[in-house]
Regions:
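Intrinsically disordered, low-complexity segments enriched in small residues
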Residues: 30-83
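Intrinsically disordered, low-complexity proline/glycine-rich segments
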Residues: 1-49, 306, 313-318, 338, ...
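Segments forming oxygen-rich coordination pockets for charged ligands
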Residues: 46-47, 101-104
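Acidic, aromatic-enriched beta-alpha/helix-loop junctions
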Residues: 81-101, 108
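Hydrophobic/aromatic beta-strand elements that line small-molecule binding cavities or substrate pockets
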Residues: 24, 62, 184
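A general structural signal for short secondary-structure junctions and capping/turn motifs
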Residues: 56, 62-69, 103-104, 112-114, ...
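Extended charged/polar low-complexity repeat regions
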Residues: 92-94, 109-655
Length: 655
């Protein structure tokens, strides 16, 4: 055996119960569900670097997120880590991943899931209807071709919420990291066949993300081009609330032509851009094959709640280098909010980045492509030294932290940490890389009991020997907690998995009622005294009205971006909120016209507050957004910081 985690349906656990999670035919020793690396964004240091990978990472920068069920959230994740089995480069360029950059490679001897964090997760091949669970990654992969999962299966309820055509298709694969969903649906895009294509065309040896589906039957759909240069690429999205988005994509050839045209028409055209400086095609990189297709802008095309009031500009916009690397990000006000720089010799390897109004962070790499130094011009810098099963992190104050690791690939974990003050902590893990014990610097040990398959915590034993136990239902939802003193708290759920009652350790129960079978939002809550509160929600999941137990109602209004614009209390008491085109709160006005105003700097720091009587308070910041002085009523208080960002001097208004 390889020692890697595996579970087969029907196997008996140490407690005598059969395993209903896992594949019906897991090969013992197969690398089922093991990732090529730890999560790039899992453990970070500084601004930020993953020291276990030696990778520069930027975990989850969100550019677009409107409220609603199954919302279209457009975010970017960067990692300089290169997997040996990469998917094609995504729409943000090498090193970057979007939420939709999920791809399943179908091989004779393996399934390789390329996730949107830049990893490759290896599974065994699945027969129609089979499901497999990765204990190390807490992820399910299921192949269609089965009407229902067995009774008691963790996914039985979520699987049954899928449309029959999805459940029964053996050509579709589905993935999820929660028994409450949503599902990531992995299919293929329809293509217009060419004149020389053999019909019917065979299915491709991969699957792409075609949509999401939740336990209430709501869906998010990606529309991919069927013909032309953009064949197979996502150009439209319909979210779970019915909004429609258009994704504007450009090819490398289009960007090259635009750059040459711009160069020729520029007033500074003494040295026109050459074809070699901005090639029409891009070579493959260590991050995968590259078609050169990039996302340049996202437009909101339809909004059911605001059909006549659509934005006149894109919600977000992107520009790229001549090598197809993400260069800059612009928000809906067309303000540049991010900038990136890359290594000219290694396309996609980020060497610097900057936020609007902030200094530039820089990075150096060794010959193996690992970050060895990050340079902060206005704060702490860090150096990284890599040895076998040991990483040393030293900051610019010469403080040293040593990480001792065990395991490989996706099971690599820090088991011992030597801190700068000389203290040492230890951590223990099971065969799936899940935390089972922690020992602090004083030698006090806390232990975690885990469900052998799901990884849910079943008990926690503290250093004094006191034990807390946790119980779950078939859907891995917490149903009871028994404290060391024997007192118990309980939770109950309805068939779709919504919380319907919650009983505290003291025996008091709060109950939740739902009016909409297709929503997880409660209509009423009733506490232990019988007092009931009522809630009304918008189609986007925003609270429209709240009625307390006395019958008093508060109403709320929002704009198309989900920002609260008004609050109406009883007896005509109202507050109105206004925002600038970047979404920052600029004023709050009451029903009598009294207004408080807010001002900001380029970085988004609040620099001034002007009260209704005209009094003005101001705050100034250093390069990293720490307040260095506040002035109110002509009096100033100032602060100074050391390189680690700690306050070393505070001067009050009296000097």
């Amino acid at each position: 055996m390889s020692g890697k985690p595996a579970a087969r349906q029907g196997d008996m656990t140490q407690y005598g119960g059969p395993i209903v999670q896992g594949s019906a035919g897991v090969r013992i020793g197969a690398p089922t569900g093991v990732a090529c690396s730890v999560c790039p964004g899992g453990m970070t240091s500084g601004n930020p670097v993953n020291p276990l990978l030696g990778a520069k990472v930027l975990p989850g920068e969100t550019d677009l997120a409107l409220p609603g069920p199954l919302p279209f959230i457009l975010s970017r994740t960067y990692s300089s880590y290169r997997t040996k089995t990469p998917a094609p480069v995504g729409v943000f360029g090498p090193g970057w991943k979007a939420p939709s950059d999920i791809r399943l490679q179908i091989r004779d001897d393996a399934l390789i899931l390329n996730d949107n964090g830049g990893r490759s997760i290896h599974f065994e091949p699945l027969l129609p209807g089979e499901a497999v669970y990765s204990r190390s990654e807490s992820m399910w992969l299921v192949r269609g071709g089965k009407a229902a999962q067995p009774d008691g299966h963790t996914l039985a309820r979520l699987w049954g919420a899928l449309p029959p055509d999805i459940r029964l298709s053996p050509h579709l694969y589905l993935a999820t990291n929660s028994a409450q969903g949503p599902w990531w649906i992995l299919g293929w895009s329809e293509r217009v066949p060419g004149a020389e294509d053999v019909l019917p065309a065979p299915l491709p040896p991969y699957r792409e993300l075609t949509g999401l589906a939740d336990r209430f039957g709501r869906t998010l759909t990606y529309r991919r081009e069927a013909a032309g240069d953009l064949t197979g690429e996502i150009t439209g999205v319909t979210d779970g609330a019915g909004r429609e988005f258009r994704l504007v994509l450009t090819t490398q050839a289009q960007r090259a032509e635009e750059a040459r045209t711009s160069s020729l028409s520029s007033s500074d055209s003494s040295r026109p851009l050459s074809a070699s400086a901005f090639p029409d095609t891009l070579p493959g990189t260590e991050y995968g094959p590259d078609r050169g297709i990039r996302l340049s802008a996202v437009w909101l095309m339809h909004d059911p709640a605001y059909p006549e009031s659509l934005p006149a500009a894109p919600l977000v916009r992107y520009t790229y280098t001549e090598a197809g690397e993400l260069l800059a990000v612009y928000d809906r006000s067309n303000t540049q909010v991010r900038a990136f720089t890359y290594d000219a010799q290694h396309p996609g390897r980020m060497v610097a980045h900057r936020y609007a109004g902030r200094p530039e962070m820089r990075y150096r790499y060794d010959d193996a492509g690992r970050v060895v130094e990050q340079l902060n011009p206005a704060g702490l810098s860090y150096r990284y030294q890599y040895e076998q099963d040991r990483i040393t992190v030293t900051d610019s104050l010469n403080r040293r932290e040593v990480l001792h690791t065990e395991g490989g690939a996706g099971l690599k974990r820090v088991v011992k940490k030597e801190l700068a003050d000389g203290s040492v902590t230890h951590s223990g893990y099971d065969a799936a890389g899940r935390l089972t014990a922690q020992t602090d610097a004083a030698g006090r040990r806390t232990e975690y009991g885990l469900n052998v398959v799901s990884g849910d915590i079943t008990d926690i034993t503290t250093p004094d020997g006191r034990e807390t136990k946790f119980y779950y239902n078939d859907g891995n939802q917490l149903t009871a907690v028994v404290s060391p003193d024997g007192l118990e708290s309980r939770r109950e759920y309805d068939e779709p998995g919504r919380l319907v009652s919650e009983t505290s350790r003291s025996g008091e129960t709060v109950r939740y009622r739902y009016d909409d079978a297709h929503s997880e939002l409660p209509a009423t809550t009733t506490d232990a005294t019988g007092s009931t509160r009522q809630m009304t929600w918008s189609r986007y999941g925003q609270l429209l009205a709240f009625t307390d137990c006395s019958g008093y109602q508060t109403r709320y209004e929002y704009d198309r971006f989900g920002q609260m614009t008004a609050v109406h209390h009883e007896e005509g008491i109202s507050l109105y909120r206004h925002y600038d085109n970047r979404g920052r709160l600029t004023s709050v006005k009451d029903a009598q016209g009294r207004e408080t105003q807010y001002e900001y700097n380029a970085a988004g720091d609040l620099t001034a507050v002007i009260t209704p009587d005209g009094n003005r308070s101001e705050t100034q910041y250093d390069a990293w957004g720490k307040a260095v002085s506040t002035t109110q009523g002509g009096l100033t208080r100032s602060m100074e910081y050391d390189a680690a960002g700690r306050v070393i001097s505070l001067t009050n208004e009296n000097g």
